[in-house]
Regions:
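N-terminal phosphate-binding or glycine-rich loops at protein starts, especially the Walker A/P-loop
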Residues: 1-45
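Short glycine-rich or small-residue beta-strand-to-loop segments that form or flank ligand, phosphate
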Residues: 2-10, 66-71, 96-99, 164-167
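Flexible, glycine/charged-enriched surface loops at secondary-structure junctions
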Residues: 31-37, 156-163, 214-218, 254, ...
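Glycine-rich oxoanion-binding loops at beta->alpha junctions
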Residues: 44-99, 104-105, 137-148, 344
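Accessory alpha-helical/coil subdomains and C-terminal extensions
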Residues: 96-101, 111, 118, 139-157, ...
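Phosphate-binding loop/pocket of nucleotide- and phosphate-handling active sites
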Residues: 252, 305-344
Length: 344
């Protein structure tokens, strides 16, 4: 078979590991031929691609980012987009398409599959919020990066008797905030699944000061809602999928904490550092397992389905199920946060 791959949406540690494993097994086990479209769906529309061979994928599983680059192109919103994709795939004699991406990218994959394009998906997001899978590659790396930052913030906050608010990624789900906050010993952990109670936040920080610890570390996910200001948007511009760029909840929260408590408060936004750099060993292994299953899905003609992790097994579900809702924290995780908080 002649198979095409692409990566869409934000980059993520482990993408290259998926590409590496899919191509390696496809060539060695199935005798496939591969191309990689550059810059996501934009590359398909522009017929812009590179060959993927055993030689030019050698060692890429160790690297961060994506060798295929990426974009946030929404084929569904481009007049004649679906027809153009079908034309390009036909010109290049493509038998199947493997799309690596989050819910936005996979919404396009599903659309194409429903319109006769043989395609399968691989879930990609550091937010770990794709429905139906226990963990996405890239999440472990993001948590490691965020945890290291929280560790470092402790010493500088302590040295200056300050409160420091650390803003991490997480538009709809607080997995990174939860994991890095717990691992990093944050005094306050705030996630999008629950509205921020500023009085409770301030009470927790005051408890620290009243009991001899004259500093505080707060971890907050970018998608959190603060009743006093709502959801903080970094830009009024939206991408082709209608998403505004979230940024600034950390700064808004820091200002409010300082105003209500009188404690000197600073904010740090970790931003894109969370999805940069080389993937952890766990994400390299997980990414390759996703890639191996993806090429098997192609040969089993499981069109319109997406690879997922269930327990210790890689299996697959329909893309429609995967993007129907976000995988979010529930009461079990709220209880962990509450049990580790000071009792105020």
């Amino acid at each position: 078979m002649r198979v095409a791959l692409l990566t869409g949406g934000g980059d993520c540690p482990g993408l290259n590991a998926v590409i590496y494993a899919a191509v390696r097994k496809g060539i060695n086990h199935y005798g496939d031929e591969f191309i990689g479209f550059l810059n996501g769906w934009r590359g398909v529309l522009d017929n812009n691609f590179i060959p993927l061979t055993l030689e030019n994928i050698d060692g890429i599983q160790l690297k961060g980012g994506t060798i295929l680059h990426s974009s946030r192109t929404n084929v569904k919103k481009i007049p004649g987009g679906i027809e153009k994709v079908q034309e390009v795939l036909k010109i290049n004699k493509i038998d199947a398409l493997i799309a690596l991406g989050g819910d936005d990218t996979q919404s396009v994959t599903l659309y194409l599959s429903e319109h006769g394009v043989p395609s399968v998906g691989v879930p990609k997001t550091i937010d770990n919020d794709i429905n139906g899978t226990d963990q996405t590659f890239g999440f472990d790396t993001a948590v490691m990066i965020a945890t290291e930052a929280v560790d470092r913030i402790h010493t500088t906050a302590d040295s200056h008797n300050r409160v420091v608010v650390v803003e991490v990624m997480g538009r709809d789900a607080g997995w990174i905030a939860y994991a890095s906050g717990v691992a990093g010993g944050a005094h306050v952990i705030l996630v999008p699944e629950k509205e921020i109670d500023i009085d409770h936040v301030c009470a927790l920080l005051k408890y620290n000061y009243d009991h001899g610890k004259h500093y505080g570390v707060v971890v907050v996910a970018e998608g959190c809602h603060l009743p006093e200001v709502g959801q903080v948007i970094g830009s009024t511009q939206v991408d082709s999928f209608g998403h505004a760029r979230l940024s600034g909840i950390g700064e808004a929260l820091a200002d409010l904490i300082e105003k209500k408590t009188g404690f000197e408060t600073r904010s740090v936004n970790l931003g894109h550092t969370q999805r940069g750099g080389v993937p952890t060993a766990f994400d390299r292994v997980l990414g390759q397992r996703y890639g191996l299953h993806a090429i098997d899905m192609v040969h089993d003609q499981k069109w319109g389905r997406i690879a997922v992790l269930k327990g210790l097994d890689i299996t697959d579900i329909t893309i429609k199920e995967a993007i129907a809702t976000n995988r979010r924290l529930d009461q079990r995780f709220f209880d962990v946060i509450a049990d580790l908080e000071a009792k105020v």
